[in-house]
Structures are given as structure tokens and as C-alpha cells.
A protein has these predicted regions:
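Activation of the activation-loop gatekeeper triad in protein kinase-fold domains
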Residues: 231-236
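Juxta-kinase regulatory segment immediately upstream of eukaryotic protein kinase catalytic domains
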Residues: 2-29
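Catalytic-loop of the protein kinase fold
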Residues: 207-209, 214
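Active-site activation/catalytic loop segments of kinase-like enzymes and analogous catalytic loops
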Residues: 243-286, 300-318
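ATP-binding pocket architecture of kinase catalytic cores
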Residues: 34-207, 222-225
Length: 343
């Protein structure tokens, strides 16, 4: 979410959105709302909304969403509302709509000041080893804080079915692969087979983000050791926290080996903590053992390969606002091959 391009589509319907925002905010200046697509999002579409009243952010599914379970607006809204006031910072929900406004579910949230770090570090931000360690530690600590929250204490006791979570996750992503694959990729099929044959016992039950990474967080521009917000909760659930850790480590360590448009390589710059160091920090703060971590890391590779294939399908269907993500076919195969080395 680092740059914006003009929205020339009808995906945001300012003529309908403006009056709705005016009603919920009681500020008629939102009648003059304008929308810009924030590029870099790989699943749901994110728009910056501007008016004389200020700025907000809108989230909606891509046009012609192919895998509806991966674009659940209600899920994002519910978990963000529940986490408000906890140690995990999230934007406040301003408006939630089931489809009457745009023809698809969407929501509007507050715009949080700070930095989304994607392909490079902004000048003067985390340019020394101490700040880089602080940024990495902040990410690990926030993930541990999320996993420490009792779901029932914030109204999320029924947010998912923890029993059998890991097995269902493998099955779910295998099904999504079969639904979106357009060419055979033997490495993906073999990785799915190995994972299904060696599913570990769940380590614990926690609220999981599902796609936790540096560029799904907003970093405080004045203090890189503090996160201002965690974004993009569409894959959140109640399940095994090691699936979150495995995904976080995948993103943290895979930048140079993965399509540059999909994974930031910033954490691989000198001075940032290693994945092993951050995993140890997470384990220390959660009190959970790092059992079968290679399985969870392999699963993260499988999941990302399927996510990448889904992005490719949406790009081919012209459903991603014209964004270019490079050679996604190679990215799918390369990610699966790297996962096989762990499985």
C-alpha cells in the first residue's frame, strides 16, 4: 500500500458512497468524496477516500471475485471491531455494508498515520541496526500479543472451529489450488500431498491473522519500533498460532527468492533480525514450543503458492485494478519447490 493511482472504474461509486459516509459521520463534506486505488494489495482492493472532511480507507473484494471465501468483508469488520482497545492496534470501522452500496460487501475504516514498508525503506527510517532490530522485534511482539488474547474475552469465542484447524487449512488451500490452477505445477501437488500426510498436532488455540507480514502493518514513522496498526484481516480465524508464525517467517525470509512484486525483501537487508531470532522471541513471549516448525514453514510456502495462483487468476480476469505483479507462473512453481525442501 505504497502508492495510489486514480480510480477510473465504478468500483467505489462515490455518488452512493458520499451520502452514506455523510450519514454515518454526520458531516456533509463527505458528499464530495473521491477515491484512489492504493496499489500493492494482492487480494481485496483498498482505496484511499478523500474529501474536505479528511481521509478514510475503503476495502472491497476485487471485481468478479473468484474465491469468495478469501474476500470475506464481514470477517475483517468483526475481528477489527473486537480487537479495538487491545494490545493489537487496528483501524476503527466507520461503515460496514453488506452489498447495498457497491453491489458487494465493503467497509470503510479510519486512515492510520504511519508507513507501509513494501519494496524499500523510506529515507531516514530504520537506517541503523538498532532501529532494524526494534522493527523486527515489534512485529514478533505484536504477533505474540495477538496469540495471547483470549478469544472469548473480546467476543470471538465462535469466530471459528479450532478442532481440526490445521487439517482443514491444508484441505481448504488444496481445494483453492484446484479451483484456480490453469497449468499443471507438479511441485504444488507434491507439496500438498506431503503436508496432508504429516499434519502435526495443534500447538494451541489462538486468534490467527492468516497473512501476517511487514507490509500488512503500519509502522510509526517517528518510532520504527512501534506498530501503529495491523491491516488485512480477511484470513483471520481461531486456530493454531504456529500457522501464523510460519507465514510470518516465510514473508520475512523469502524476499530474494520470490517475485519482487509480491514479497518485500526489506527484512533481508543487513541489520534486521533473522527469522530464527524472531521465532525465538515469539516463543519466549507466548510460552509455546517451536514444535514441527519446518512443517508450518512448508505449509506457508504451499499457502503462498496458492495465493499467488489466485492473484494470477484475478489479474487475468482484469479484476485487480490494472496492477502488474510480474511473472506469477514462475513464482508459483518456485515457491512450491522451496516448500518441498522443508516438507
Amino acid at each position: 500500500m505504497t502508492s495510489a493511482v486514480s480510480d477510473t472504474s465504478l468500483l467505489t461509486r462515490p455518488d452512493l458512497l458520499g451520502p452514506a459516509l455523510s450519514r454515518v459521520t454526520r458531516d456533509d463534506r463527505w458528499q464530495q468524496v473521491e477515491a484512489e486505488l492504493i496499489t500493492g494489495g494482492k487480494s481485496n482492493l483498498t482505496y484511499r477516500l478523500r474529501s474536505p472532511a479528511g481521509e478514510l480507507v475503503l476495502r472491497r473484494p476485487p471485481s468478479g471475485a473468484i474465491l469468495t471465501t478469501a474476500h470475506d468483508m464481514k470477517r475483517e469488520v468483526r475481528v477489527q471491531r473486537a480487537l479495538a482497545g487491545t494490545a493489537v492496534p487496528v483501524p476503527a470501522i466507520v461503515l460496514s455494508d453488506d452489498g447495498g452500496l457497491l453491489g458487494v460487501p465493503c467497509y470503510v475504516m479510519t486512515r492510520v498515520d504511519g508507513l507501509v514498508i513494501r519494496d524499500r525503506l523510506p529515507a531516514g527510517i530504520a537506517d541503523g541496526p538498532a532501529e532494524r532490530v526494534a522493527l523486527g522485534n515489534a512485529l514478533a511482539d505484536c504477533l505474540a500479543e495477538l496469540h495471547a488474547i483470549d478469544p472469548a474475552s473480546i467476543g470471538l469465542a465462535d469466530f471459528g472451529r479450532p478442532a481440526g484447524f490445521v487439517e482443514r487449512q491444508v484441505r481448504r488451500w488444496r481445494t483453492q489450488w484446484e479451483a484456480s490452477a490453469d497449468v499443471p505445477v507438479p511441485a504444488v501437488d507434491e507439496l500438498a500431498r506431503r503436508l496432508a500426510a504429516s499434519i502435526p498436532a495443534s500447538s494451541a488455540v489462538a486468534i490467527t491473522h492468516g497473512d501476517y507480514r511487514l507490509d500488512n502493518c503500519i509502522v510509526d514513522a517517528r518510532d520504527p519500533g512501534r506498530l501503529a496498526a495491523v491491516l488485512d484481516w480477511e484470513l483471520s480465524a481461531l486456530g493454531d498460532p504456529l500457522t501464523d508464525l510460519g507465514m510470518f517467517l516465510f514473508y520475512w525470509e523469502s524476499g530474494p527468492r520470490t517475485a519482487a512484486a509480491l514479497v518485500t525483501s526489506v527484512p533481508c537487508l543487513p541489520g534486521f533480525p533473522s527469522g530464527a531470532e524472531l521465532a525465538g522471541r515469539w516463543a519466549e513471549r507466548t510460552g509455546l514450543p517451536l514444535v514441527d516448525l519446518d512443517w508450518y514453514r512448508a505449509f506457508a510456502h504451499f499457502k503462498f503458492a496458492v495465493i499467488t495462483q489466485g492473484i494470477k487468476a484475478r489479474v487475468n480476469a482484469s479484476a485487480m485494478g490494472g496492477q502488474d505483479f510480474g511473472d506469477l507462473t514462475s513464482a508459483v512453481a518456485d515457491t512450491a519447490e522451496a516448500g518441498l525442501a522443508l516438507a
